[in-house]
Design a protein with these regions (language model features):
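Extracellular glycan-recognition regions
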Residues: 25-128
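Bacterial Sec-dependent N-terminal signal peptides
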Residues: 1-26
Length: 128
C-alpha cells in the first residue's frame, strides 16, 4: 500500500482517555466519526472523553463480528506526517482500550495502543 497518495485520518480512541498532543494540528479543528455524548477539549491541547460501552473498531474477526462504532476524533492528512500523543485512562472492563488509528475507510485501518485484558494493560495492535 502506498500511503503518500492516500488521505489518512488519524485519531485517538479512548475509554475515559486523556490525549495530549504537541502537534501543529489544533484539536479544535479536528472532526468526529461516532461522536460520544460527553467530551471536551481542555486548554486547547487535551481531549477528554467518556466512550460508550461496547463500542469498538474491529473487522471480520475470528470472533465472528465486525464493528465500526467507536468514537473517532481525527484530522485528514495527505503525504508524510508525524503524530505524538500522550494517553492515560481509567481501565475498568476487559477490552477497554485507547491509542492511535490510521484510517483510510471502514475496511482499511490500523489501530495501536493499550488494551485492558485479564486485569492488565497490554500493548495492542489491529491491522485490516
Amino acid at each position: 500500500m502506498i500511503m503518500k497518495h492516500l488521505k489518512i485520518k488519524i485519531m485517538s480512541i479512548a475509554f475515559m482517555a486523556v490525549t495530549t498532543s504537541s502537534m501543529a494540528q489544533s484539536l479544535n479543528k479536528m472532526n468526529w466519526l461516532n461522536e460520544p455524548q460527553q467530551w471536551e477539549i481542555k486548554d486547547g491541547k487535551t481531549l477528554v472523553m467518556d466512550v460508550p460501552a461496547k463500542t469498538d473498531f474491529w473487522r471480520i474477526s475470528h470472533y465472528g463480528f465486525t464493528v465500526d462504532d467507536g468514537p473517532f476524533y481525527y484530522a485528514t492528512y495527505g503525504g508524510e506526517f508525524e503524530a505524538k500523543v500522550k494517553i492515560t485512562g481509567n481501565y475498568v472492563t476487559t477490552f477497554d482500550q485507547m491509542g492511535l488509528m490510521l484510517r483510510i475507510d471502514h475496511e482499511n485501518w490500523i489501530k495501536a495502543g493499550v488494551e485492558y485484558v485479564d486485569g492488565k494493560q497490554n500493548v495492542s495492535a489491529v491491522v485490516t
